[in-house]
């Protein structure tokens, strides 16, 4: 049975929105070129954006909100934090029930002024009377902080953006920034996995908006889907192309490239096995020429494509062997380990390495709990690999990988959640010296509780500017007092020895200066900033 992140509260059905990942302090080649670490005020400290996509605005259930917390020498602080909602503080649009503002997040310097900007998915946005069509808000950085002044709202069929808004397209479900044409302005890829294409229901698609001195523009924007414009794969119903996006320079040619998750792609007769399309950048932007189609039955890729694996459900790019080519980690949260059902949905992560010709299956890896030094035991419904983030947590110049395991059972607490951390080296990622974190022990802030979903989202950034990436962990079902699923975020700090729970922090709305009020089912921490994967 396929595992869906669905919760029922007060008659509402809400999905745990897509996770976002970020790389911090990893070196330019590992980053999505042009994406710029999420430093909205350009003070040298990475900042943290946190989505609460089911936040109620007044009586508008699920309108959504985004908190922004700023970095400092002491790390992330709630002091001076901001709360953005549509139609307030200059942010474009109008808050409406079910908009899901904050469903996804991505950061890049879209106008190349030295300040990181923030793209916010509102995938449930109604366009006119078209419910769930989806939209993307863009907020711009400044010397003071992020501002709604000059903000933009993009959706299909307006301002040059190709396509037409249709019910439940979920435009903005996934976002990723990179400079795909290498003109110095970050561009934005937008996934909408429920797009119907040529009669193929929920085939999925992705738009690309290009940056300019005036910021993002729909002029020259592109529309990609499988089976057209050179994109590999057949156009099929229910593939969900565009469910996840990640940018990196996989062939190190100076142009950002884009990986697109297709987690419900059928491989042979195995439905929902999953795949990843990779599109390469050029002076003219992204194009299908030389694009690739990856899955577990592809040449060199470790593993076997099986029904309901969900290969491509999460993605993160980083230079895990420090050879100058970005590599790609691919979450396979439905992977079965051992005999079913005990190992069903235990989860795994594939890693493909970059080269002068792009990503290659040669030397690929498959990681799972309990093998090769990776901590933990593969168990039913753990979903190891549901979320991914790359960053140099030990400041040795090589990207490392954080892996969310949000449904991990810890000490009898069902679905408490955990995060595994794998470290990079000249030979690539390794389970040697890997770590496992969860709330409570080892100094990690918070209390170990059932159904918290620690690790549902992960994101890296150098919040204290010490040269090592730090890790933000979303805990969207954390109860704040009696308020179930109000949500929280933990921050763990990096250093020469890697990540540590010592000095870690816990943040939630209404405490420690964080703007807003913790309320039942806000799901603060469902999404985290996705700056450069």
Residue ranges and their predicted role:
Residues 3-7, 20-533:
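Conserved beta-strand/short-helix segments
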Residues 14-20:
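Hydrophobic membrane-targeting signal helices
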Residues 6-10, 14:
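Hydrophobic helical h-region of N-terminal Sec-dependent signal peptides
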């Amino acid at each position: 049975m396929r595992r869906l992140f669905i919760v029922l509260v007060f008659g509402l059905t809400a999905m745990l929105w897509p996770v976002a990942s970020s790389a911090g302090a990893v070196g330019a080649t590992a980053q999505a070129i042009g994406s710029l670490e999420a430093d909205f005020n350009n003070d040298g400290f990475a900042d943290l954006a946190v989505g609460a996509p089911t936040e109620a605005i007044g009586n508008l259930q699920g309108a959504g909100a985004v908190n922004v917390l700023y970095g400092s020498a002491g790390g992330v602080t709630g002091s001076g934090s901001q709360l953005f909602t549509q139609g307030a503080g200059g942010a474009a649009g109008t808050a409406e029930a079910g908009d899901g503002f904050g469903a996804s997040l991505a950061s890049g310097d879209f106008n190349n002024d030295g300040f990181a900007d923030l793209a916010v998915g509102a995938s449930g946005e109604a366009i006119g009377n078209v419910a769930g069509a989806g939209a993307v808000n863009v907020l711009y950085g400044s010397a003071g902080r992020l501002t709604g002044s000059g903000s933009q709202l993009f959706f299909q069929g307006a301002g040059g953006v190709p396509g037409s808004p249709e019910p439940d397209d979920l435009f903005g479900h996934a976002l990723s920034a990179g400079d795909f044409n290498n003109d110095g302005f970050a561009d934005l890829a937008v996934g909408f996995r429920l797009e119907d294409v040529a009669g193929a229901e929920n085939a999925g698609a992705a738009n690309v908006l290009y940056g300019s001195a005036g910021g993002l523009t729909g002029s020259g924007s592109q529309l990609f889907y499988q089976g057209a414009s050179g994109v590999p794969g057949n156009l099929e119903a229910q593939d969900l192309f565009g469910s996840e996006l990640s940018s990196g320079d996989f062939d190190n040619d100076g142009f950002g490239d884009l990986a697109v998750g297709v987690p419900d792609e059928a491989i042979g007769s195995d439905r929902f096995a999953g795949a990843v399309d990779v599109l390469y950048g050029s002076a003219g932007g992204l194009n299908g020429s030389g694009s690739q189609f990856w899955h577990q039955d592809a040449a060199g890729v470790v593993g076997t494509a099986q029904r309901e694996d969900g290969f491509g459900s999460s993605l993160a790019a980083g230079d895990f062997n420090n050879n100058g080519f970005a590599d790609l980690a691919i979450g396979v949260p439905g992977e079965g380990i051992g005999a079913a059902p005990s190992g069903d949905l235990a989860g795994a992560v594939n890693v493909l390495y970059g080269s002068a010709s792009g990503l290659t299956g040669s030397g690929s890896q498959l990681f799972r709990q309990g093998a090769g030094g990776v901590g933990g035991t593969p168990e039913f419904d753990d979903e190891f690999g549901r979320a991914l983030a790359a960053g140099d947590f030990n400041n040795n110049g090589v990207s490392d990988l954080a892996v969310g395991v949000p449904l991990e059972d810890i000490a009898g607490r069902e679905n408490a959640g955990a995060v595994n951390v794998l470290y990079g080296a000249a030979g690539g990622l390794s389970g040697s010296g890997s770590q496992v974190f969860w709330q409570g022990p080892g100094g990690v802030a918070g209390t170990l509780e059932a159904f918290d979903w620690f690790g549902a989202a992960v994101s890296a950034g150098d919040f204290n500017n010490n040269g090592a990436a730090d890790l933000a962990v979303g805990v969207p079902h954390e109860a704040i007092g009696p308020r179930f699923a109000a949500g929280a975020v933990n921050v763990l700090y990096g250093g020469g020895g890697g990540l540590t729970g010592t000095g870690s922090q816990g943040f939630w709305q209404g405490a420690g200066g964080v703007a807003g009020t913790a309320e039942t089912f806000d799901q603060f921490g469902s999404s985290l900033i996705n700056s450069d994967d």
